[in-house]
Each structure stands twice: as structure tokens, then as C-alpha cells.
A protein has these predicted regions:
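Alpha-helical scaffold segments that form or flank carboxylate-/histidine-based iron centers
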Residues: 67-76, 105-112
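Amphipathic C-terminal alpha-helical segment
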Residues: 81, 112-119
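Residues in soluble alpha-helical coiled-coils and helical-bundle/repeat scaffolds
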Residues: 58, 79-80, 97
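Acidic, glycine/proline-rich low-complexity segments that act as flexible tails and inter-domain linkers
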Residues: 2-10, 14-67, 117-135
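A general alpha-helix detector
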Residues: 53, 70, 87-88, 105
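Iron-sulfur (Fe-S) cluster-binding segments and ferredoxin-like electron-carrier domains
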Residues: 88-99
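Short, thiol/selenol-centered motifs that function as redox-active sites or metal-ligating centers
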Residues: 71, 75-87
Length: 135
């Protein structure tokens, strides 16, 4: 049997030579939701304001949400933030971004970020496949 590293929980998981792709999305969303609730429940004014600013920054404006999410995806990839990449991938997917558009944006991110972002590109591609599988 083979072992695969779960990119969400960084633990070994034994499977029958398959990665259960839908688990990638579910595990990410479950963990993110749980931890965001805890962070917000702590009632830290700065954290709450940052969350609020982030939400408002991605709202419809001169740029549509789809474009803003692609910008967030590129920036997150260049900054090598896997959780941020996953979040922007999922939101982009929900906004109707196509695989071709996502890959073009990720190509720009790889160009700007250099080869050090290639591992993040791989994980992003894997997460996108999981999103498509979950249709």
C-alpha cells in the first residue's frame, strides 16, 4: 500500500492507492470554518477588522468578484500561502472561473513567483480537480 500526505492536515493517510479528492475540499472547509469561528469568538478587535476588510475588499466594485478572486489567487500563489490559494480557488470556481482561466492565472503567478511556487501550483491543480469532482 502507498501513503499519501494530506495537504490539509499534514498527516499520513493510507488508502487503496487513491486519494479521495472530495475529502480535500471538505477537510479544508471544515477546518477553516472551525478555526474562523474560534478566532472570531475570541473577540479580538484587530482580527475582526481584518476579516471584515478582507470580506469587503473582494465585494463587487470597479472590478467584478471573479477578477478580484483571480487577483487574490495569483497573489496568494506568489506569497506561497496554500490555505489562501485553496480559498481563492474555491471562490473562483463558484464565481464561474474555468479551468483554462485558472491555469492562465496560475501561469502568471508561476512566472512572477518563480519556480519556487511550482509545488503550490501542483497542490492548486489537485485542489481544482477536487472541486470539479464535487460538482
Amino acid at each position: 500500500s502507498e501513503y499519501f500526505y494530506c495537504t490539509i492536515c499534514i498527516q499520513k493517510r493510507q488508502t487503496n492507492n487513491l486519494i479521495i479528492m472530495s475529502d480535500l475540499v471538505k477537510e479544508f472547509n471544515d477546518y477553516r470554518g472551525k478555526m474562523n469561528e474560534k478566532l472570531l469568538a475570541d473577540n479580538n478587535k484587530i482580527v475582526k477588522r481584518i476579516f471584515n476588510l478582507d470580506t469587503n475588499a473582494y465585494a463587487e466594485g470597479a472590478l467584478d468578484v471573479k477578477t478580484k478572486e483571480l487577483l487574490g489567487l495569483v497573489a496568494s500563489t506568489v506569497l506561497r500561502c496554500d490555505d489562501c490559494v485553496k480559498y481563492h480557488l474555491e471562490t473562483s470556481y463558484k464565481e464561474g472561473v474555468t479551468k483554462e482561466e485558472m491555469m492562465e492565472a496560475m501561469g502568471i503567478a508561476t512566472l512572477v513567483g518563480g519556480t519556487i511556487v511550482v509545488p503550490h501550483l501542483r497542490r492548486a491543480y489537485e485542489f481544482w480537480e477536487a472541486l470539479e469532482e464535487n460538482k
